[in-house]
Amino acid sequence: MLTPRVLRALGWTGLFFLLLSPSNVLGASLSRDLETPPFLSFDPSNISINGAPLTEVPHAPSTESVSTNSESTNEHTITETTGKNAYIHNNASTDKQNANDTHKTPNILCDTEEVFVFLNETGRFVCTLKVDPPSDSEWSNFVLDLIFNPIEYHANEKNVEAARIAGLYGVPGSDYAYPRQSELISSIRRDPQGTFWTSPSPHGNKYFIWINKTTNTMGVEIRNVDYADNGYMQVIMRDHFNRPLIDKHIYIRVCQRPASVDVLAPPVLSGENYKASCIVRHFYPPGSVYVSWRQNGNIATPRKDRDGSFWWFESGRGATLVSTITLGNSGIDFPPKISCLVAWKQGDMISTTNATAIPTVYHHPRLSLAFKDGYAICTIECVPSEITVRWLVHDEAQPNTTYNTVVTGLCRTIDRHRNLLSRIPVWDNWTKTKYTCRLIGYPFDEDKFQDSEYYDATPSARGTPMVITVTAVLGLAVILGMGIIMTALCLYNSTRKNIRL
């Protein structure tokens, strides 16, 4: 939380020095003889005098030291002169005594330590300088550095929950988030003549900084916020030897509520477990979404051995989270109402939404394939009304004009299911042909329900029944011939006996 304080320190220091300088000029291009308003605003840019660029602040010599934590014994009254940017310090003591006065170390108070700002909007914070007015000889030069430290999130979530529980969420250096290279946004300086200087900004009008000399206030705006602005601002006040005096942190929390929440409950076959996935799309930051499950209104707890969650980040769109759960047995339980409850939380902001789905249960159909009277015949029992039949010959789909399918009745064991019969002429091509009867319309693999058989039309297969037929005919002829002969013999013998008598 150093960033908010640093920013505040910088703002207040600049304002304070403006008030103290006997001939304070707020802009490098403004004449001291011109009256200026108490409010100064500017974008970070190169402010120079006579075309000279901003000079570097000298480094502190090794023998120098800064006096701190001393209290002032004199009361100061600050009055702003009208018509000039100067301030008169009325002291109870003389100038000689004034030169020996000591003052408290300045402090910076910011209005917040965290700025929650939604995507594409503007984030703001204000800092105020708290310090006894020092003399110009003591505080003749200072620097306020505004530094941005980005925080980038890892593209995996193995430690998301652990980091959240441990309070490491958003902390640089944790397994969940880490800082990229820091960047100087602006360096604001006041010289002994009361002129304010600032370094150029590489971001154009991305940042807007203003100073109010009356209230000793500095404000910072971050415009059109995007994911790259997530991090913390660091406000550092340095003395004229470039030594840091105050360091404040203000965290910039980029926010984005989930764009959508959906529950996917895929269909299952009777006897399998119900499964569901909750998809939370396009939110920020990762870890700001909490998912809970309900089954028919009752709390359902995912199992660690087979359920879980994972997320990924899409550039320009935010994070997407998928949470999964496994429930019950579809062969025993009726299809449940599965609900996913999502809570998005950032700071004091909470947004909740939910989605519900009911899975569909399919029953295993019964089908068989046989050959009869020159047809391949497929008999199907207990299929939904949307199921149709497709024939394949040698694994090649056949036009539906080559076969026909009819409904033969209703299934006796499953409501709203029916029985079908489909047939296709077999090929009389003197070869062995594969016929496949496949059910189409199930939300599973296409070959999930099918039956295949071979029809043998080779000469060898055809020869066997012919031999049997010829043999049968010859056998019958022999039997008939023998019967005729025996009958004739019997009649002949009977006739001879009658003649003898």
Curated annotation (Swiss-Prot):
The chain crosses the membrane at residues 466-492. Glycans are attached at N46, N91, N100, N120, N212, N354, N400, N429. Residues 53-86 are annotated as: Disordered. Belongs to the herpesviridae glycoprotein C family. Residues 28-465 are virion surface. It is found in: Secreted; Host cell membrane. Residues 258-356 form the Ig-like domain. It is a single-pass membrane protein. May play an immunoevasive role in the pathogenesis of Marek's disease. It is a candidate for causing the early-stage immunosuppression that occurs after MDHV infection. InterPro entries: GA_GC, Ig-like_dom, Ig-like_dom_sf, Marek_A. Keywords: Glycoprotein, Host cell membrane, Host membrane, Host-virus interaction, Immunoglobulin domain, Membrane, Secreted, Signal, Transmembrane, Transmembrane helix. Residues 493-501 are cytoplasmic. This is Envelope glycoprotein C homolog. Residues 1-27 form the signal peptide. It comes from the Viruses. One of its GO terms (cellular component) is membrane. Residues 62-72 have a biased composition (Low complexity).
